[in-house]
A protein has these predicted regions:
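Catalytic-core elements of nucleic-acid end-processing and repair enzymes
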Residues: 1-188
Length: 188
């Protein structure tokens, strides 16, 4: 009789444990469904936010192009690309360049109207892209241009304002630039 009670006890425990596990699994499924729904909503909001930013950038692009593209192009016409090691450093010369890079790297070049700083002659915006790679693999940097033709590195950012694996290498190369290196095609 003692053996029978022990068997019944084990069977009861197993059934209780199984019922408990079934409840836990139900709760996990509910939790997972909630998490997945939350993620889907977040993705949709991110997508809508991104579309809105792109729409605003395109609208700004149209408005600015109508007003003063020539002024920006006049300021940037003497600045050309520079090739150093495995990188190509290229200035953003048009409003379209600013919009494209801003959208591609998901950074605030258009929203904060960096092209105005370039038009004023206060700074120059360049991309640093490894040879054979796309803009997303590179970084964007701002060079402050002083009246005596000295330059200094400002911001240096990659995709979504984060540094790339080449961040330090690019930074060190840019610090060696002189104003003369940026006028016309040159190799540092």
């Amino acid at each position: 009789k003692a053996g029978q009670n022990k068997k019944n006890f084990k069977k009861t425990c197993l059934e209780l444990d199984l019922n408990y596990n079934i409840e836990v699994m139900k709760q996990k499924k509910i939790r997972d469904a909630i998490i997945n729904e939350f993620k889907a909503i977040k993705r949709q909001k991110d997508w809508k936010r991104r579309r809105e930013i792109i729409r605003k950038n395109e609208e700004k692009l149209k408005n600015v192009e109508k007003e003063d593209v020539k002024t920006l192009e006049q300021v940037t016409k003497n600045f050309n690309h520079v090739k150093v090691d495995e990188f190509v450093f290229k200035p953003l010369k048009t409003i379209k360049d600013f919009a494209d890079v801003s959208n591609e790297l998901e950074i605030c070049l258009m929203q904060n109207e960096y092209y105005n700083k370039v038009k004023e002659g206060v700074s120059m915006i360049y991309t640093a892209i490894p040879k054979g790679k796309k803009i997303k693999d590179g970084e964007v940097f701002e060079l402050y241009v002083y009246p005596d033709e000295r330059i200094a590195l400002g911001q240096l950012v990659g995709f979504r304002n984060k540094p790339t694996k080449n961040h330090e290498k690019i930074k060190n190369i840019v610090k060696t630039f002189k104003y003369e290196n940026l006028v016309g095609e040159a190799n540092v």
